[in-house]
């Protein structure tokens, strides 16, 4: 179990309260697909992902990005129980989708970049520290069901 100080919890929940999940989620997923093109294979049903322009303009990217950011809001609300929060999602990504665990870390890195770009003034090193800790905990919780 990870220990969160009151200040860390406040920095995480305070910033998360400002997040527009639609806007940030769409940007995060688009960045993931562009920067790490091998992740596109998990989204073959999305159609054209052949270029950054195609990815950004793809109508299936924003809703799935919103879904990702919305699901990331769950551990923000349950900082003391992240592993159980992601139990079902871990099972889905392990057994059905067969997503390699390294991809969770990459998505966490993208989330940090998106938060930093949208909230540059608020996303100080002191704020980044608990967020890095959170994405690391999430990246370790998601592959929990892997064998």
Swiss-Prot record:
Residues 3-147 form the Globin domain. Keywords: Heme, Iron, Metal-binding, Oxygen transport, Transport. Pfam families: Globin. GO terms for cellular component: blood microparticle; haptoglobin-hemoglobin complex; hemoglobin complex. The keyword Lyase does not apply. GO terms for molecular function: haptoglobin binding; heme binding; metal ion binding; organic acid binding; oxygen binding; oxygen carrier activity; peroxidase activity. Red blood cells. Heme b binds at residues 64, 93. One of its GO terms (biological process) is hydrogen peroxide catabolic process. The keyword NAD does not apply. Belongs to the globin family. Heterotetramer of two epsilon chains and two alpha chains. Beta-type chain found in early embryos. PANTHER family: HEMOGLOBIN FAMILY MEMBER, HEMOGLOBIN SUBUNIT EPSILON. This is Hemoglobin subunit epsilon. The lineage of its organism: Eukaryota, Metazoa, Chordata, Craniata, Vertebrata.
């Amino acid at each position: 179990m990870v220990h969160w100080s009151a200040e860390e919890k406040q920095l995480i929940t305070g910033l998360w309260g400002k997040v527009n999940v639609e806007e940030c989620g769409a940007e995060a997923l688009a960045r993931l697909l562009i920067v790490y093109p091998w992740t596109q294979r998990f989204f073959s049903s999305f159609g054209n992902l052949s270029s950054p322009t195609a990815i950004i303009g793809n109508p299936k990217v924003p809703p799935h990005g919103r879904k990702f950011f919305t699901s990331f809001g769950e551990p923000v609300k349950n900082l003391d129980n992240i592993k159980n929060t992601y139990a079902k999602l871990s099972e889905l990504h392990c057994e059905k989708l067969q997503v390699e665990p390294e991809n969770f870390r990459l998505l966490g890195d993208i989330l940090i970049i998106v938060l930093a770009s949208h909230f540059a003034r608020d996303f100080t090193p002191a704020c980044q520290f608990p967020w890095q800790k959170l994405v690391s905990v999430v990246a370790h919780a998601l592959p929990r069901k892997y064998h």
